[in-house]
Amino acid sequence: MGENEGIDKSFLDTVKFDDRGLIPAIVQDHETGKVLMMAWMNRESLEMTLERKKACYWSRSRNKLWLKGESSGNMQEVFDILIDCDGDTLILKVSQIGGACHVGYHSCFYRKVNEDGSMQICDTLMFNPEEVYGKKH
Protein backbone atom coordinates (compact mmCIF):
# COMPACT_ATOMS: atom_id res chain seq x y z
CA MET A 1 0.00 0.00 0.00
CA GLY A 2 2.30 2.72 -1.28
CA GLU A 3 1.76 6.37 -0.50
CA ASN A 4 0.94 7.38 -4.07
CA GLU A 5 -1.43 4.51 -4.82
CA GLY A 6 -5.09 5.42 -5.13
CA ILE A 7 -7.95 3.08 -4.39
CA ASP A 8 -7.99 0.32 -6.98
CA LYS A 9 -11.65 0.08 -7.92
CA SER A 10 -11.00 -3.31 -9.51
CA PHE A 11 -10.10 -4.67 -6.05
CA LEU A 12 -13.27 -3.23 -4.51
CA ASP A 13 -15.31 -4.68 -7.34
CA THR A 14 -13.92 -8.18 -6.69
CA VAL A 15 -14.91 -8.15 -3.02
CA LYS A 16 -17.92 -10.42 -2.44
CA PHE A 17 -19.97 -8.84 0.32
CA ASP A 18 -22.68 -11.02 1.88
CA ASP A 19 -26.42 -10.33 1.70
CA ARG A 20 -26.03 -7.74 4.49
CA GLY A 21 -23.26 -5.98 2.55
CA LEU A 22 -20.54 -7.26 4.88
CA ILE A 23 -17.30 -9.21 4.59
CA PRO A 24 -15.33 -10.80 7.46
CA ALA A 25 -11.86 -9.37 8.10
CA ILE A 26 -9.28 -11.35 10.03
CA VAL A 27 -6.76 -8.99 11.61
CA GLN A 28 -3.13 -10.05 12.10
CA ASP A 29 -0.04 -8.41 13.52
CA HIS A 30 2.00 -7.57 10.41
CA GLU A 31 5.30 -8.57 12.04
CA THR A 32 4.40 -11.75 13.94
CA GLY A 33 1.32 -13.04 12.10
CA LYS A 34 -0.51 -13.31 15.43
CA VAL A 35 -4.29 -13.17 14.94
CA LEU A 36 -5.59 -10.16 16.84
CA MET A 37 -9.30 -10.12 16.06
CA MET A 38 -12.04 -10.70 13.53
CA ALA A 39 -14.37 -7.89 12.52
CA TRP A 40 -16.85 -7.05 9.79
CA MET A 41 -16.35 -4.52 7.02
CA ASN A 42 -18.76 -2.99 4.55
CA ARG A 43 -17.77 -1.19 1.36
CA GLU A 44 -17.61 2.20 3.07
CA SER A 45 -15.39 0.98 5.92
CA LEU A 46 -13.12 -0.81 3.44
CA GLU A 47 -12.81 2.34 1.31
CA MET A 48 -12.04 4.38 4.44
CA THR A 49 -9.40 1.84 5.49
CA LEU A 50 -7.75 2.00 2.07
CA GLU A 51 -7.75 5.80 2.06
CA ARG A 52 -6.57 6.41 5.65
CA LYS A 53 -4.43 3.30 6.19
CA LYS A 54 -6.15 3.04 9.60
CA ALA A 55 -8.51 0.12 10.21
CA CYS A 56 -12.19 0.96 10.04
CA TYR A 57 -14.90 -1.64 10.51
CA TRP A 58 -18.69 -1.91 10.52
CA SER A 59 -20.20 -2.38 13.97
CA ARG A 60 -23.20 -4.68 13.67
CA SER A 61 -24.30 -3.97 17.25
CA ARG A 62 -24.15 -0.18 16.86
CA ASN A 63 -25.04 -0.23 13.16
CA LYS A 64 -22.37 2.31 12.26
CA LEU A 65 -18.78 2.75 11.10
CA TRP A 66 -16.20 1.97 13.77
CA LEU A 67 -12.73 3.48 13.44
CA LYS A 68 -10.67 1.06 15.54
CA GLY A 69 -9.20 2.90 18.52
CA GLU A 70 -11.42 5.96 18.15
CA SER A 71 -12.46 5.85 21.82
CA SER A 72 -9.59 3.81 23.31
CA GLY A 73 -6.62 5.14 21.35
CA ASN A 74 -5.74 1.55 20.39
CA MET A 75 -5.49 2.24 16.65
CA GLN A 76 -4.50 -0.18 13.90
CA GLU A 77 -2.18 1.04 11.15
CA VAL A 78 -2.84 -1.08 8.06
CA PHE A 79 0.19 -2.39 6.14
CA ASP A 80 -1.44 -4.95 3.83
CA ILE A 81 -4.85 -6.23 2.85
CA LEU A 82 -5.16 -9.74 1.44
CA ILE A 83 -8.26 -11.24 -0.16
CA ASP A 84 -8.94 -14.97 -0.32
CA CYS A 85 -9.48 -17.03 -3.47
CA ASP A 86 -13.27 -16.73 -3.28
CA GLY A 87 -13.19 -12.98 -2.64
CA ASP A 88 -15.33 -13.34 0.48
CA THR A 89 -12.80 -12.99 3.33
CA LEU A 90 -10.07 -10.44 4.01
CA ILE A 91 -6.92 -10.41 6.09
CA LEU A 92 -5.67 -7.07 7.38
CA LYS A 93 -2.03 -6.99 8.44
CA VAL A 94 -1.68 -4.21 10.99
CA SER A 95 0.53 -2.57 13.53
CA GLN A 96 -1.55 -2.63 16.71
CA ILE A 97 -1.19 0.26 19.14
CA GLY A 98 -2.12 -1.06 22.59
CA GLY A 99 -4.59 -3.91 22.85
CA ALA A 100 -6.88 -5.06 20.06
CA CYS A 101 -9.47 -6.54 22.42
CA HIS A 102 -12.06 -4.38 24.15
CA VAL A 103 -11.51 -6.35 27.38
CA GLY A 104 -7.88 -5.21 27.44
CA TYR A 105 -5.88 -8.03 25.90
CA HIS A 106 -3.47 -7.75 22.99
CA SER A 107 -5.61 -10.22 21.01
CA CYS A 108 -9.33 -11.01 21.17
CA PHE A 109 -8.19 -14.65 21.13
CA TYR A 110 -6.74 -14.50 24.64
CA ARG A 111 -8.27 -17.73 26.01
CA LYS A 112 -6.94 -21.19 25.27
CA VAL A 113 -9.15 -24.27 25.60
CA ASN A 114 -7.37 -27.04 27.49
CA GLU A 115 -7.83 -30.76 26.82
CA ASP A 116 -10.20 -31.05 29.79
CA GLY A 117 -12.42 -28.27 28.40
CA SER A 118 -11.27 -25.64 30.87
CA MET A 119 -9.91 -22.33 29.64
CA GLN A 120 -6.79 -20.40 30.53
CA ILE A 121 -5.57 -16.91 29.72
CA CYS A 122 -2.77 -17.11 27.14
CA ASP A 123 -2.20 -13.46 26.24
CA THR A 124 -0.99 -10.18 27.69
CA LEU A 125 -3.36 -7.73 29.37
CA MET A 126 -2.53 -4.36 27.79
CA PHE A 127 -4.98 -2.04 29.58
CA ASN A 128 -7.79 -1.90 32.12
CA PRO A 129 -11.03 -1.56 30.14
CA GLU A 130 -12.80 0.26 33.01
CA GLU A 131 -10.15 2.99 32.85
CA VAL A 132 -10.53 3.29 29.08
CA TYR A 133 -14.27 2.83 28.57
CA GLY A 134 -15.68 3.44 32.06
CA LYS A 135 -17.69 1.01 34.16
CA LYS A 136 -20.52 -0.87 32.49
CA HIS A 137 -23.93 -0.04 33.85
Curated annotation (Swiss-Prot):
Pathway: Amino-acid biosynthesis; L-histidine biosynthesis; L-histidine from 5-phospho-alpha-D-ribose 1-diphosphate: step 3/9. It is found in: Cytoplasm. Binds 1 Mg(2+) ion per subunit. One of its GO terms (biological process) is L-histidine biosynthetic process. The keyword ATP-binding does not apply. Its main location: cytoplasm. Keywords: Amino-acid biosynthesis, Cytoplasm, Histidine biosynthesis, Hydrolase, Magnesium, Metal-binding, Zinc. Catalyzes the hydrolysis of the adenine ring of phosphoribosyl-AMP. Homodimer. This is Phosphoribosyl-AMP cyclohydrolase. It comes from Chlorobium phaeovibrioides (strain DSM 265 / 1930) (Prosthecochloris vibrioformis (strain DSM 265)). The lineage of its organism: Bacteria, Pseudomonadati, Chlorobiota, Chlorobiia, Chlorobiales.
